[in-house]
Amino acid sequence: MVVANVYSDGTSEEILGRALKDYAKCEEVVIASKVYFPMYDGSNAKGLSRKAIFREIDETLRRLQTDYLDLHIIHRLDRSTPIKETMKALHDLVQMGKVRYIGASSMYAWEFVKCQYIAEKNGWTKFVSMQDLYNLLYREEEREMFPLCIDQKVAITPWSSLAKGCLTREIGTQTERSKNDAIVNTFFH
């Protein structure tokens, strides 16, 4: 189950936390959440600085009502924070037991390699998964990212596998969402 701190301002994590408490045990499922986008106003409200990562993991764990995440995914690469700072902070979360594994999302293959190189060079935790935009309408990841992940034995977990709903209906059908969704209008029309 993948949620993110920013989805519905944390409500997705709260709903999942309640569902897990009522219907399953954390040991029976794999829980993943993402970090990057702003959760409040302020200079440290977003991104992948050490301060932002540490603040958001505590909030995520509180909302999920658990002591750890199985997989903590960076929602985007933060180009305003040094990669070394981000990778060290993520490694420290693993060392602290708050996170079992780390993953990445939505970056270029060369950026992903750079993150992995920095982690390996310093003996830190490396990413075990890559989540990029991929579906029957948008297949760019087949060019570089997928071959890289296969070679490095990194799990691939696509997002928007139904192209924001475009693959669930006849091509060209308009919905209220498709009229206003920037991602749909950018990638799938």
Q: Which positions does each model-derived feature cover?
A:
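N-terminal binding-site loop/beta-alpha segment at the start of enzyme catalytic domains
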Residues: V2-V30, D67, Q95
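Short, acidic/polar
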Residues: K46-Q65, F112-Y117
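Active-site-proximal loop/turn and secondary-structure-junction residues that shape catalytic pockets
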Residues: N5-Y7, V35-F37, H75-D78, S106-Y108, ...
